[in-house]
Regions:
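Ser/Thr/Gly/Pro-rich, low-complexity flexible regions
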Residues: 1, 5-193
Length: 193
């Protein structure tokens, strides 16, 4: 079974006619999905921000970004994405592991960039902060080693109603050292410079 394959089947209840209930019928459909065990170390090392809607809005010369990630030694099931979009601004993401069929990621409100770097001017308290969008689910795949993240940005210190920048979609995929080296040689925007 490949990483994203599932197996579906229809089961037929075999019983005496008098024990059948019309309300429920005698068939049920079952779908088995492949689930890989969670290992936090699958999400450390080189990672490629494959795409981000933020790039199109504020980093027009960037289509992908190579970063490094490491396991947070102080928080369970959490990684630190070093220099995520801007140098000196790391982002922490926590992986939920209580339901492997619903593998979600969580992110607390945290600094994302300086307003000068992001917008070429000073706004509010001079920093852009990022938090997990409350409207959409962000998730991960241990089998495919990626996260799909909805991230909402805001600027503290701005007047109420004018502090939110927007919600952006990021897709981050972990790559091998060899793949990272090829990306570096190809000139992919990277935080490792």
């Amino acid at each position: 079974i490949e990483v994203t394959d599932s197996l579906g089947m229809v089961l037929q209840l075999v019983s005496k006619e008098e024990s059948k209930w019309e309300l429920y019928g005698t068939e049920t459909k079952v779908i088995l999905e492949k689930v890989c065990p969670f290992d936090i170390h699958l999400f450390e090392g080189y990672a490629l921000i494959v795409t981000s809607t933020y790039f199109g809005s504020y980093m027009k010369d960037v289509s992908q970004r190579l970063i490094r990630t490491k396991v947070d030694p102080n928080a369970e099931n959490t990684i630190i994405m070093k220099d995520y979009f801007y140098k000196g601004y790391d982002l922490k993401v926590k992986f939920t592991t209580n339901d492997l069929l619903n593998p979600l990621i969580e992110m607390e409100d945290q600094p994302f960039a300086s307003t000068m770097e992001a917008f070429d001017t000073i706004y509010g308290d001079w920093e852009v902060w990022a938090y997990q969008s409350g409207y959409y689910l962000s998730y991960y795949s241990s089998c495919e080693r990626f996260i799909f993240q909805y991230m909402t940005l805001h600027v503290p210190g701005m007047p109420a109603g004018k502090d939110e920048v927007g919600t952006y979609i990021n897709v981050v995929k972990w790559v091998s050292d060899d793949e990272a080296q090829i990306l570096i040689e190809e000139g992919v925007n990277n935080s490792l410079k």
